UniProtKB/Swiss-Prot annotation:
Keywords: Aminoacyl-tRNA synthetase, ATP-binding, Cytoplasm, Ligase, Nucleotide-binding, Protein biosynthesis. It comes from Ralstonia nicotianae (strain ATCC BAA-1114 / GMI1000) (Ralstonia solanacearum). A motif ('KMSKS' region) lies at residues 265-269. A motif ('HIGH' region) lies at residues 12-20. GO terms for cellular component: cytosol. This is Tryptophan--tRNA ligase. Homodimer. The keyword ATP-binding applies. Belongs to the class-I aminoacyl-tRNA synthetase family. GO terms for molecular function: ATP binding; tryptophan-tRNA ligase activity. The lineage of its organism: Bacteria, Pseudomonadati, Pseudomonadota, Betaproteobacteria, Burkholderiales. The keyword Protein biosynthesis applies. One of its GO terms (biological process) is tryptophanyl-tRNA aminoacylation. Residues 280-305 are annotated as: Disordered. Residues 295-304 have a biased composition (Basic and acidic residues).
């Protein structure tokens, strides 16, 4: 029905580290070659937890965008924009809030989890309670087909689907819908119209899911239909309402296994990170001062790589021969810890090199980055204007 867009965003709340690269940005680089992708800076979302320190957001926005480009996100393949520069996000958030039950927001698992984790902040705010609905608006405003998330974010996408379903139920009704849908089917042409109606019957009366998918594919191939007729025919397949806001699907992404300097998951809150564009001297110092197996008090003491955080980084950055060298050398005390750490340092610096090269031109000429974002915001704005035109019309807000 709509282009199979991918929508994803990140909050600008500090420097990006290698955990962000391995957990999110590498996936974005892959997705941009497969789908029309919209990647955005979620600055309004950042305010839900940093409303008392907006300077953190301001400092982070442009640096984060440079990190995206450094990672290989390509503005010729994906649309990059800043959430607050596309005001339709806020308008749809407001309109969706009118019909979204409060209980839906309160039951989102991450709501209570975040309040527990961030006890030092006062998160008893309307904005923080409503951020899952703002996420829903971010997704639905682009009629995104797919949202790449980890397991912990699946409930947010499920709530988005419920919000879309409720909206379509409340506002997808229109006078004479069935006749308008039948008239629209005729525009498919005789044979295709007959096939469409047969597939609809097979789905609705006999519950054949394959028939539903075939009918959807048939409509997707019919380029001559207007947007309104297309919405009616998709809606008619499953009931008697237009599909104004389609339900997105989860693109489940594997959780980042990037270990931090202490062996825990790399995270800013643990203070165990290496920034994506950290300078060479700092990388060397951080890795060389990493803790190792406590059993290796002296150079001649054998150790167990399984008890050493450095070994986890070898699994990311070292090839099979190097890992075998580490296993044998550590267990026999044939190598010292500093020797063991050097291939990790080399691997990180090797990974960073193309990032630093890509980033340099945007650091040298910030106007290049500003132009990319201006173009991306324009592209995003065109999509959101079309969605909001139909949303306002469905909700009876187009007074003349």
């Amino acid at each position: 029905m709509f282009p199979e867009r991918v929508l994803s965003g990140m909050r600008p709340t500090g420097a990006l580290h290698l955990g962000h690269y391995h957990g999110v940005l590498k996936n974005w680089v892959r997705l941009q070659a497969e789908y029309p992708c919209f990647f955005f800076v979620a600055d309004w979302h950042a305010l839900t937890t940093h409303y008392e320190s907006p300077e953190v957001i301001e400092e982070s926005v442009w640096e984060m965008l440079i990190d995206w480009l450094a990672a290989g996100v390509d503005p010729t393949q994906a649309t990059l924009f800043i959430q607050s520069r596309v005001p339709e996000h806020a308008e749809l958030f407001l309109l969706l809030s009118m019909g979204t039950p409060l209980g839906w927001l309160e039951r989102v698992p991450t709501y209570k989890d975040q309040i527990e984790k961030l006890k030092e902040k006062d998160l008893s705010t309307y904005g923080f309670l409503g951020y899952p609905l703002l996420q829903a608006a971010d997704i639905l405003i682009y009629r995104a087909g797919f949202v790449p998330v980890g397991e912990d974010q699946v409930p947010h996408v499920e709530m988005t689907r419920e919000v879309a379903r409720r909206f379509n139920y409340l506002y997808g009704r229109e006078p004479g819908f069935e006749q308008k849908a039948l008239d629209a089917a005729k525009k498919l042409g005789g044979k295709r119209a007959k096939l469409y109606l047969e597939l609809r019957t097979a789905h609705q009366e006999r519950g054949e899911d394959d028939a539903l998918e075939q009918a959807r594919a048939l409509l997707a191939e019919s380029q001559s239909l207007s947007m309104g007729d297309r919405e009616r025919l998709f809606g008619y397949l499953e009931g008697a309402r237009k599909i104004i806001l389609p339900e997105p699907q989860v693109l489940l992404t594997e959780a980042s296994r990037m270990p931090g300097l202490d062996g825990q998951k790399m995270s800013k809150s643990y203070g165990n990170t290496i920034r994506m564009r950290e300078d060479k001297a700092s990388v060397e110092k951080k890795v060389r001062t990493m803790p190792t197996d406590p059993a290796r008090v002296r150079r001649t003491d054998p150790g167990d790589p399984g008890k050493c955080p450095v070994w986890q980084l070898h699994q990311v950055y070292s090839d099979a021969d190097t890992r075998e060298w580490v296993q044998k050398g550590c267990r026999s005390a044939g190598i010292g810890c500093l020797e063991c750490k050097q291939p990790v340092i080399d691997g990180i610096l090797r990974e960073q090199q193309p990032m630093l090269e890509r980033a340099q031109k945007y650091m040298d000429d910030p106007s290049l980055l500003r132009a990319i974002i201006a173009d991306g915001c324009d592209t995003a704005h065109k999509v959101t204007q079309e969605t909001m035109r139909e949303v306002r019309e469905a909700m009876g807000l187009t007074y003349s």
